[in-house]
Structure formats: structure tokens, C-alpha cells
Amino acid sequence: MDLLLVEKTLLALFAAIIASIFISKLRGKRFKLPPGPVPVPIFGNWLQVGDDLNHRNLTDLAKKFGEIFLLRMGQRNLVVVSSPNLAKEVLHTQGVEFGSRTRNVVFDIFTGKGQDMVFTVYGEHWRKMRRIMTVPFFTNKVVQQYRTGWEAEAAAVVDDVKKNPKAATEGVVIRKRLQLMMYNNMFRIMFDRRFESEDDPLFVKLKMLNGERSRLAQSFEYNYGDFIPILRPFLKGYLKLCKEVKEKRFQLFKDYFVDERKKLGSTKSMDNNQLKCAIDHILDAKDKGEINEDNVLYIVENINVAAIETTLWSIEWAIAELVNHPEIQAKLRHELVSQLGPGVQVTEPDLHKLPYLQAVIKETLRLRMAIPLLVPHMNLHDAKLGGYDIPAESKILVNAWWLANNPDQWKKPEEFRPERFLEEESKVEANGNDFRYLPFGVGRRSCPGIILALPILGITIGRLVQNFELLPPPGQDKVDTTEKGGQFSLHILKHSTIVAKPRVL
């Protein structure tokens, strides 16, 4: 950093201190703010709580300050909600007031400052994007159109694992093959395309760029520059890398997928009844002037991240828990055999006949929630919540993981026990009918991908348990389930090596 930049930073720091003190006094008179640790000028609570605002750290703060608390992170207000009643207020009762998305220096790059659907503010653009994405992605018709493809992809995973001699002895990182499956599941829907193998050069490049995008976006290491603008010059290299990754991804999306589909469409005359895949519907909306070319790419961006990775994390968590709980794995296998018959492979229409499989999925989503803090919400205007004033443009986090793991709300929540969803919690569903359990959120900004995720989880987990005895690698009693939390993600820290012994069907 040159001398001029240092001088400017120090001048900005002095000005910000004066402004912070003034605003703090003004707001102290105006607002009845939620409780929280006492902030200091400029940095707020950042020096006290640091960058790592994962679900467990926020749970510890909730135990100290209550079901709603405020963190002043530099110039940003961060309100954390940790009770079902307040979650209902944010997501349902006051869903319009808290229906926007907060800004973030990194997500601003990856979403073009909200040109996508997931991270845009609540309003006309969001309604338009949600409508355009719903028909080709998030309906029962889509499930029925693509379910046989999902079943074929799961069958291919089973075949490939059986062919790998290491799988039944020393074990394999099965996640790698499942990642290819998930890309194929979603790229069938998006582009009527699939990748033949893990070594496909285009798949390798796409996976690498998407992985780097997720790492950069979910990391806590850029928080200081996002919260405290005077420190943003220190993020220059980080943000430059984000821009480079975005440009490479979008060029790849455009050259190899969107433009290829355009060329195919130009050689055929297709009306709406002949549109084969999601991108056809989206390009049709662009041709009608409803969205622009950039919006098309941001939709592809959303699906590449939100639909693929989150479902993959949940599959990986489910496998790890079944390996570590062989009695649950055996009970699930017994249900599959007794309900479907020996050797009969589970299909999507079978899922409603398999309550224990559904309970295993629900329990995985409860204990190992892929998005434990949901996607952050924001109020565009001053609002009220829990008897407190919430200043405009506050970032609102719903700690959905704690809602589903609070011992005051659940019986022995630390245990992986699918039976709870067949016994005392039998009426609780993943669609948000109970505000203690919100793996996909609820309300206007809930995740529409639930309609795809649940059947894919059921087919994949069911087939793996039918065809293999899933075990930890030699010399280990269990696989490591240490968590890796992100800005609002939760995945397993170390991708597990799993022994998959083929079963005689």
C-alpha cells in the first residue's frame, strides 16, 4: 500500500470515528435496539466476535443475549433470530418487510449486484425472475419429466462403484462420483446435457471454477472489508480474484452451454410445447424482452451453486451418518427390501411408501442443515421485531440450525435419530409447516429447490443402501464428521473415504 493510500485510510478512519460516535448517540435516542455486546466506534463488535459468524458461534451468543440480538459489525447491523416465533415473524408474518437480500462486496460481484433471483432485493425483478425460473425448474411436471434420468444417474453411480476394486476393500471417496451425478441431474434439466465421466475436460473445468466460486463466496476471510469500508483497500486482491473467477465461469456458461443451445434452437422451429429443457424457456423469456442476456447467465449461476452443491452436501452428510450408525443403515435397508422386494431398485414413485427413508432424510437435514443460517434477509425500511426497532438495511440471520437443535424444543437433538420423525415429531415436514424445522426456509424467499432435492436425496440414498453395505475405512470405527461452516453453508470438513461392499440382491 503506498503512502497516499495510507494517508487516505487514516483520514477516513478519523472521519468515520467522529461519524460513528455521532450516529451512535443519535440512534441511541431514537431506537430501542435488540440486546447484544457493547460495540466500539468504527469496528462495532467485530473485534469481539471476529469474522467467523458460523451457526454454532451465533448459537453461543444467543444463549448469552437471547432469542434476538444485535451485532454491529463495522457499519452494518446484524440481527440474529433464534426462536420459532421470531423466525415466523421474519419469514412469514412480516415476509414483505424482511423480504429483501443484504448487500455483500463478494456476492455483489458474483450476482451483478442482484441481477439474479436468489440475492436480489424483494420487488418486481425478483417476482419476474422467480416466475421465469419456476416453470422449467420447480414444478411436479419437471420432477416427472426428469425422474427417470435421476434414477439412471443413481444406477450409474452404483455400477461405477461396483466396478472399482478399491471400493469394497480400502474404500473410495464416493463424493467424487456423486458430484458428477448431481451435475448430470441438473445439467439434464438446464441444457439437456450430461458429462460422461469424472475426467471429462469440460466437467473438470466447470467443477474447478464452481468450487473456487463457492470457496471465495462462503469464506469468512473477507468479512472485515465488507463490514468496515475503510479496510476495503486490503481486499483489493481478493475482489480481483472474485472478478476473474466470475468472468471465466460466465464465459464458460456462455460458450459451451447457452450459445450451444441457441444454435440448436435456431436450426429447429420450437413452440412452447416443444421446449425441451430449462434454458429453452429462459431464452424464450429473453427473446420476449422479459429479461436480458446477463439475467440468463445469472440464472445459470444460481443453479450451478444453489441446486448442485447443497444437495450434494446433504447426500454426503446422510452417507456419513449411516456409516456411523450401522443399526440405522440396517433398519433402512430392511424397509427397502420389505416394501419393494429383494433386488427391486427404488424409484421416485416409491418414496411415499418408505417412511423410514424419508425420516432419515429429514433427520439429516435437521442435524446437518446445508444452509444453517438460511440466506440472509434484509429490511429496506425501519421495522419492528420482537418489540425492538430494527434499523433499515439490517442484515437478518435466522439461525435455522439452532431452531432444529435446541434442546428446549427437541428431544435429545444432538443424536442422529430418524425415529423422532415417526414418533413425537411425525407431523413435522421439510416444507416449513413447523417453524422449528426450516431446512429450506419458508415464505416468499424460501428455497424452491425443495421439490427437486427431496426426490433426488431419496433415490440416491435409497439406491446406495440397497446395493452396498456402507462402512468406515479399515482401521476406523467411524468417519470424521467435523463440520465446515461458511457464510451460510454447512458441509463436511473432510470428504469421507467409504468402504462400499456390494450386497447380493
From Swiss-Prot:
Superkingdom of this protein's organism: Eukaryota
Membrane topology of the entry: Single-pass membrane protein
Single GO MF annotation: trans-cinnamate 4-monooxygenase activity
GO BP annotations listed: biosynthetic process; lignin metabolic process
Catalytic reactions of this protein: (E)-cinnamate + reduced [NADPH--hemoprotein reductase] + O2 = (E)-4-coumarate + oxidized [NADPH--hemoprotein reductase] + H2O + H(+)
Enzyme class: oxidoreductase
Tagged with keyword Metal-binding: yes
Cofactor(s) this protein requires: heme
Gene Ontology cellular component list: membrane
Transmembrane segments: 3-23
Pathway membership, UniProt: Phenylpropanoid metabolism; trans-4-coumarate biosynthesis; trans-4-coumarate from trans-cinnamate: step 1/1
Subcellular location: Membrane
Enzyme Commission designation: 1.14.14.91
Main subcellular location of this protein, as a coarse class: membrane
Binding annotation for heme: 447
Keywords per UniProt: Heme, Iron, Membrane, Metal-binding, Monooxygenase, Oxidoreductase, Transmembrane, Transmembrane helix
Transmembrane in keyword set: yes
Residues the record lists as binding (E)-cinnamate: 213-218, 306
SUPFAM superfamilies according to UniProt: Cytochrome P450
Gene3D superfamilies, A to Z: Cytochrome P450
Alphabetical list of PANTHER family matching this protein: TRANS-CINNAMATE 4-MONOOXYGENASE (PTHR47948:SF4)
Family: Belongs to the cytochrome P450 family.
Primary role: Catalyzes the first oxidative step of the phenylpropanoid pathway in higher plants by transforming trans-cinnamate into p-coumarate. The compounds formed by this pathway are essential components for lignification, pollination, and defense against ultraviolet light, predators and pathogens.
Designated name of the protein: Trans-cinnamate 4-monooxygenase
Organism: Zinnia elegans (Garden zinnia)
Organism placement in taxonomy: Eukaryota, Viridiplantae, Streptophyta, Embryophyta, Tracheophyta
Gene that produces this protein: CYP73A12
